[in-house]
Amino acid sequence: MLFSISFFDVVVNIISGIAMIIFIIASMIKSKNKILSWQCIGHMIFVFVETMTKAWSSIVQEVIGITRNLLTITKKNTKVISILLIILGAVIGVAVNIIFKPKDAPWFGSWVGYLPVVANLEYSIIVLRKNSTVRTIKLSFCISSILWGLNFLFLGVYVSAILNFICAITALISFFKFKNNMNIEEEEVKEN
């Protein structure tokens, strides 16, 4: 229930807070594979949290995210696999959102349940592109974090909602800092 606080809510918020700290760390890393590795750990923790909160559409997206990142890290993703993962995430996410509508959470099955689907869809497209850069991933991660933050707000996982919004800001700052560092390096190369 929105804005209810119980022992269960406290436990869920603590565990999700740990996962979000991992995602914040990932947003500050400059190596693509390290970003994706840290995110895999965060996704695994969130599968546990979302199982506890019965956020089935979110769980589908976490599993797709783990799969996507591992395939990207191990360089085993192909265009066919990439497209299949994107389609599976969207189709299964939408289906699960329609099928599972808990009575105690009337906003599920509505637009809120689609937030994780859209977040994962846009992020998957960016990460799986062969020419994606660290900057592009950071910006996509910012957008994804905003969508996940809204989702967690409605799940009652307030720590993750707040930290997702902080993570979005951190990724955006890192995005601009990384650009500025690239410009400085380019100027230094031109001067030499």
Describe each region flagged by the PLM:
Residues M1-N192:
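Alpha-helical membrane-protein topology signature
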